[in-house]
């Protein structure tokens, strides 16, 4: 029995807001950030017959890759809780979140590079974030995975990771694969396409409504499943 294929459009945009500087938006990221890329492109020159395997094709078809927009070398002094990078203090304040208060002495150090993308959909679609398992994770990192419904919940994704050895630097280069995103819906055999959308005050307002974790622990997941009240019918436009 053949099943009809559906095509769902996912809107994406660089996340252009930072609370670090009042009334400052990261408009330059529009040109600095790379467009998400289909990860199946890694095999475009491969002649191996595994490419004919429908199980492999189905697995890869809804994955996209996110590349690093900047060169960063991060060095951490865990004892003194200080960092040193190859960029300016302004860059560090905006894009690097060394999450000192979110791990214990016995844990691996936790950090986020806030190279953020926001994905939205006009029907229920779940996003999953994965390490760059085909291209290779940035050295000395272990990626933090996640998933949520981008119809109900408007929040960005970023490169959050544990440092495997905080006595050694984490180095990423512009254009280096950082992580993957994958989209899943309830429709059988669904396909997706990505469409760049404009960053707007409306998106920012919706996103701020999806940040209860800043104030109350244990509430985000319950609210995500309930949905963002008063979200407009259409965000992908």
Whereabouts are the PLM-identified features?
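Non-catalytic terminal segments and appended small domains
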Residues: 1-156, 162-237
């Amino acid at each position: 029995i053949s099943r009809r294929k559906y095509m769902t459009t996912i809107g994406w945009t660089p996340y252009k807001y930072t609370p670090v500087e009042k009334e400052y938006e990261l408009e330059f990221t529009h040109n600095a950030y790379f467009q998400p890329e289909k990860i199946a492109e890694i095999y475009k020159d491969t002649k191996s017959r595994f490419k004919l395997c429908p199980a492999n094709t189905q697995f890869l078809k809804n994955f996209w890759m996110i590349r690093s927009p900047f060169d960063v070398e991060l060095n951490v002094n865990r004892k003194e809780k200080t960092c040193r990078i190859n960029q300016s203090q302004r860059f560090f304040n905006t894009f690097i979140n060394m999450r000192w208060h979110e791990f214990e002495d016995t844990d691996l150090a936790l950090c986020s590079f806030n190279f953020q993308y926001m994905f939205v959909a006009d029907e229920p679609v779940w996003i999953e974030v994965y390490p760059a398992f085909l291209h290779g994770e940035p050295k000395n990192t272990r990626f933090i995975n996640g998933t949520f419904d981008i119809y109900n919940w408007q929040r960005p994704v970023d490169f959050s990771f544990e440092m495997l050895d905080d006595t050694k630097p984490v180095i990423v280069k512009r254009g280096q694969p950082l992580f993957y995103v994958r989209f899943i819906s309830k429709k059988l055999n669904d396909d997706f396409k990505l469409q760049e959308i404009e960053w707007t005050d409306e998106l920012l307002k919706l996103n701020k409504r999806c940040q209860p974790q800043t104030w109350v622990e244990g509430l985000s997941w319950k609210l995500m499943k309930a949905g963002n009240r008063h979200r407009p019918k259409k965000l992908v436009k």
